[in-house]
Amino acid sequence: MHGPVSRSSSSSNMTDVSSPAGGAASPVEMTTSSSSAATTSASSSKPLTNGANKTTISTVAGGVAPGAVPGPGSGAIPASSSSGNQVKLEHHHRQSNNNRPAATNRSSETKLRSPAGESDGASRLMTPAGSSSSPSQSPSQTQASIQTQTSQQDRLAKASTTASQQDVDEVARLFEEKPEAFEKWLTERAPPEALSRLQEFIENRKPHKRPSVTSDLFQQWMAASPTVQQKSPRSLSNSSASSLPECRRHLMDLDEGELFMELIRDVANELDIDVLCHKILVNVGLLTHADRGSLFLAKGTPTNKYLVAKLFDVTQKTALKDAVTRASAEEIIIPFGIGIAGMVAQTKQMINIKEAYKDARFNCEIDLKTGYKTNAILCMPICNYEGDIIGVAQIINKTNGCMEFDEHDVEIFRRYLTFCGIGIQNAQLFEMSVQEYRRNQILLNLARSIFEEQNNLECLVTKIMTEARELLKCERCSVFLVDLDCCEASHLEKIIEKPNQQATRAIKSADSFEEKKMRNRFTVLFELGGEYQAANVSRPSVSELSSSTLAQIAQFVATTGQTVNICDVIEWVRDHNQIRAEDEIDSTQAILCMPIMNAQKKVIGVAQLINKANGVPFTDSDASIFEAFAIFCGLGIHNTQMYENACKLMAKQKVALECLSYHATASQDQTEKLTQDVIAEAESYNLYSFTFTDFELVDDDTCRAVLRMFMQCNLVSQFQIPYDVLCRWVLSVRKNYRPVKYHNWRHALNVAQTMFAMLKTGKMERFMTDLEILGLLVACLCHDLDHRGTNNAFQTKTESPLAILYTTSTMEHHHFDQCVMILNSEGNNIFQALSPEDYRSVMKTVESAILSTDLAMYFKKRNAFLELVENGEFDWQGEEKKDLLCGMMMTACDVSAIAKPWEVQHKVAKLVADEFFDQGDLEKLQLNTQPVAMMDRERKDELPKMQVGFIDVICLPLYRVLCDTFPWITPLYEGTLENRRNWQDLAEKVEMGLTWIDHDTIDKPVEEFAACADEEIKDIEFTVTTLNCNQQSQHGSEDSHTPEHQRSGSRLSMKKTGALGKAVRSKLSKTLYNSMDGSKPKTSLKLLESHVSEDMDDKSPTSPSQPQASGSMGRMSASSSTSSTGGQMVDKSKKRSKLCALL
């Protein structure tokens, strides 16, 4: 009797061992293994006990036992294979025999050949077996196999005991010292057995994969196409009709318990839902002797559930492929509560009908079509672990002579479906993961397509529609694009304009539905029909859109921003008062329509799917997938529109640059005039001096001075700069400076002259190449091009276009870009004669030098420069060191106004302060914020103090280290020290109430005294007896407890709000200056003691000595000393002494 053939989840891991077709079955001995392990692992063998003979039928994946003779076509390894393979098999036996009884370890396993004509991929059913040996294996062969295994184990044990630790260390030392020799021995002389054992050791040390369904089966399933999956051994249940009776007769020899367990194992690990359902119906037929069966799966939403026939009328002879094809061709949908299966699904109760035609719920239409008569029906629900209905199984007519299903059949059916419910839910989850994986792959491909098709909107939308149609299996797909006024010039800026968060959140309640419809007017329509139809792109008119029902539905979605899933189009049109177009509605069954939005959540289009291929409505799952498509579609369309508009903006920018270049370039008349001018010598402009000033130079002289610097550095002839090009470039640079108060062309000239003086007078040209000198002079002249009078912080706060364009060193990057723009303008390229390598080098120098004028860059580089100087660095020719040196020189030149003579420095400081105050006013006006002290006009009196801080933090440390390293630039350091003393003096005077900033010069710092100069002050006597009198001598009743605001004194009177008043101080100022000039005062002044008696520093120590004054003021103090009351005098403070010296 031949062994039966059935389906098994592990059949794909089995190897057929068969004799020629038509021959008798000859069992062949296979590799021994544990039967318990075979029943628990999908990759292990599954033995079957065949009736009373108890013959063990099993397989082991990968081969046969040593000495076994494989049949023709076998995939097993013959006994005459290499010794390496033999060692692998023996090692496998040793692993399987560990910690197990000898009788169990030597239970033989065999596999019978399938009957003639049976498919090689057919699955086999296996049940637990005894431990009897196969009759085809002789006792001598079995004994030889056991002896071979024993000898292998003894040899390994002996090797482990004889090898000492010293031997192991010696071998390890040889391997470490001569790895090449060991590798050569392995490749040339190592025996195969040693190589095989080495491979085993390596494999055993590898980490094992986690035993998971997704680790093997899922990846296998993903790699296979649907065709391959249907033809794979584990998925095929469509064996020939002639084999099924054989299988049935064999299983009938099993007792009920063994058969039940075997059929449970048959479906336990099956993940293909089609194969699983086919196995369930076939196995249920075996258990209950039913003629045929059907299986329905629950679908739909919680409020609208229905059953779908997965497989219908499956008999023992129905092949899987035929069953699946028939179910797909004639999809049967049964709502819950309708018919026998629907009633079972709704009530979760079993129905056992003995006579079907007498039951009102029975539908005889199928019998009429097929000619088959249904007598008995047993229908039972399939539930998951939570008790929810996931399907219904139905069997029809018994075949063993009984006319109805008894209680025993019901119990067997119920018990078996309990296990089947677990398998079905697992298979459904696996199918969902497979679908999700495929969807993700499609979405990834879609994302890839989006990035590939950035420059063509039509190709992009066509790709998106094709992917959506293939994934969701719909008949047609359409995309409507909303009119974005792309032709308007203002829209080009709107596309890239940073969105206003408040504006995007604001909702205008006054907008009506019709107004929104007008804004969301469609201009482009993309349509994609069947599989072999090309996409159609059109621009429908308003009348065409208003007469199309599909367009009206899309218009509704675009206006409301809602997703609509329409099952009945006619009813939806009637409910929403839309115009019905008969030509479209008649062929439309279901519509899924969704808005397409951009990054600002603005509707830019509508995607529409029409009619699913199987005629059913679109599900929530379809809507979720389509939502992902809509998101990708929105990103793709938005990006493509951005790209198209960016191209337009680039074209627009080129036009603007052409216009800017024309207007930024100096005129031909100016160029010719400067070319013909005579350039004076450098000494006449005082170019070699660090005390250079441009105050006496007219604008044309400034350009001539720049030309002289280029000539003196021999740059014109060295780099073959055409003279007219150089003149035009200088004039163009001057033209591109804005007329701000400080950062203008004059400032650029002073910075360039300081660099020239450092190179020539300071002898820094010794450390520079001619190309670097050219780059530094160009950088100095261009380092503040197009300066707007505001700093980088202001650009960032106001979120100006420059701050968006450049995130760091905003203005410096803009200055460099303007420099490049001028050089690229026609007739302005002074680098035109340079080689490409020299051009790159000089442009790199210019860029680095201009960016170094940002004080933030200075602070980053200063520590590295100080470290080099402190280490005694004298070689500055390295690239990094040269870059640091040039950066420090640029900063030194940029702030060099602080080292100019005092009569120049205080005027420049006034210009800087005015520009800063203008920025502070803008911050108050535009940002509604309080500016910092240096930019706050209301704190202008603090400027001297801030100047001292600026010198101490930035200027003096820089000039000191440069002076220590390069002593020829000492004048910069000395001039800075001198100006610091002047600013410190002014700061102390401001603390005493003197201000200066409202004057163009600082010649008359006591400016408040001139406020009421026009008023005639009469009869005011002012006699200066002393500037420091004892408080108690004048006011004996006042002591230290007297409130300060009640005390009178000269300090209060000297302040702007003092008791003396502006008129008195104006007269005082005139008198003091007239006295200094030697002229006689017009009015005899006497300073009342009540206004000047208070000491300016209450904590000053007393002294019996009286201070002396010089000049006429000293004489005034001496002559008036007799009018004092003789009170005790105190010493003057330091500040009082300075005030006396001023007076």
Swiss-Prot record:
Residues 1141-1143 form a propeptide. Residues 1-19, 31-45, 75-84, 131-153, 1109-1127 have a biased composition (Low complexity). Keywords: Cell membrane, cGMP, Hydrolase, Lipoprotein, Membrane, Metal-binding, Methylation, Prenylation, Repeat. SUPFAM superfamilies: GAF domain-like, HD-domain/PDEase-like. Belongs to the cyclic nucleotide phosphodiesterase family. A divalent metal cation 2 binds at residue 784. GO terms for biological process: cGMP metabolic process; signal transduction. Binds 2 divalent metal cations per subunit. Site 1 may preferentially bind zinc ions, while site 2 has a preference for magnesium and/or manganese ions. A lipid is attached at residue 1140 (S-farnesyl cysteine). A divalent metal cation 1 binds at residues 747, 783-784, 894. Its EC number is 3.1.4.35. The modification Cysteine methyl ester is found at residue 1140. It is a lipid-anchor. It is found in: Cell membrane. Signal peptide: none annotated. This is cGMP-specific 3',5'-cyclic phosphodiesterase. It comes from Drosophila simulans (Fruit fly).
